[in-house]
């Protein structure tokens, strides 16, 4: 079955970079790429109670025309980058907020994964992803989200870091995309545990053994760092090994339970300099 990949775009350079990354990541796979531009009209917002323009009104039609014109230019650019018979392109323009447009497109087209990239709006060098991307990483739970920093240029992933505290029971379905990407690119999965004490509880050990069973057909290894704050420890590990991607399972309320005072997806999402694959907890 073809893989269906959603690529949100605002026609910026960082969005184009994420698109190119996705095309290269899935270069040899049969894929349908859905390019999505969610547009609004200046002074109006889907997220407020304000009345907003309807089809036929000048401001609405101008925004729609700009979106469609952006896609014409984008397709011209992509023809130069990617003349791949295995890839099929679809363009979608919609008057909606980004988050709702993504959720609607996932539902209507049975999307397998979202790939997007954006830089921080603040202009601060330390802020890699903007709030839109982090919001999608947290709130789009229907499928995995791969967020690509603007500074990243595609290289075939050779190593994917998977941080865990071993406190939750692993489910194969949660890890499908991590395993798929690792197998497809012959990448190693580096399972990283950051703790104050290196000893695992009986429950943690059982969960680690379950993870071993799930990862048994992949190349993987286990690593432990002690006396590190989690985000800093992850960053240090990645930088020391020149890893190519990081993958998380986003728990319903908070990454790693009580290990953090705020969700790790925000901490790593704002500051990561490599692609972040956010997978989601499966209840059953």
Which residues make up each language-model segment?
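Gly/Ser-rich helix-loop-strand patches that form or flank binding pockets
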Residues: 103-153, 240-241, 245-284
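A conditional alpha-helix N-cap/helix-loop micro-motif detector
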Residues: 15, 95, 126, 171, ...
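N-terminal, Lys/Arg-enriched amphipathic/low-complexity engagement segments
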Residues: 68, 72-76
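A short helix-to-beta-strand connector/capping loop
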Residues: 80-90, 216-221
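Charged docking surfaces used in two-component/phosphorelay signaling
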Residues: 90-101, 227-231
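Small/aliphatic-rich secondary-structure junction motif
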Residues: 1-56, 159-224, 243-245, 271, ...
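A short acidic, glycine-rich active-site loop
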Residues: 54-69
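Outer-membrane beta-barrel translocator/channel fold
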Residues: 224-227, 253
């Amino acid at each position: 079955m073809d893989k269906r990949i959603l690529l949100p775009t605002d026609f910026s350079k960082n969005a184009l970079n994420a698109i190119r990354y996705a095309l290269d990541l899935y270069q040899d796979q049969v894929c349908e790429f859905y390019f999505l531009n969610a547009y609004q009209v200046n002074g109006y917002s889907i997220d407020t109670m304000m009345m907003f323009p309807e089809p036929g009104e000048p401001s609405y039609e101008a925004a729609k025309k700009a979106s469609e014109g952006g896609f014409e230019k984008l397709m011209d650019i992509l023809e130069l980058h990617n003349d791949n018979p295995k890839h099929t392109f679809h363009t979608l323009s919609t008057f909606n907020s980004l988050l709702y447009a993504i959720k609607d497109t996932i539902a209507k087209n049975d999307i397998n994964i979202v790939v997007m990239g954006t830089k921080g709006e603040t202009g601060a060098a330390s802020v890699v992803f903007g709030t839109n991307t982090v919001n999608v990483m947290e709130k789009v739970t229907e499928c995995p989200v791969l967020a690509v920093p603007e500074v990243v240029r595609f290289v075939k992933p050779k190593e994917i870091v998977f941080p865990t505290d071993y406190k939750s029971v692993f489910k194969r379905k949660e890890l499908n995309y991590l395993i798929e990407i690792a197998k497809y690119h012959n990448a190693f999965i580096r399972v990283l545990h950051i703790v104050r004490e290196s000893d695992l509880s009986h429950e943690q050990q059982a969960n680690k053994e379950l993870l071993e069973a799930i990862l048994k057909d992949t190349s993987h290894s286990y690593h432990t760092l002690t006396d590190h704050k989690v985000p800093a420890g992850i960053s240090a590990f990645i930088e020391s090994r020149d890893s190519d991607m990081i993958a998380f399972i986003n728990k319903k309320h908070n990454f790693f339970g009580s290990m953090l005072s705020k969700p790790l997806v925000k901490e790593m999402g704002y500051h990561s300099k490599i692609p972040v694959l956010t997978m989601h907890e499966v209840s059953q």
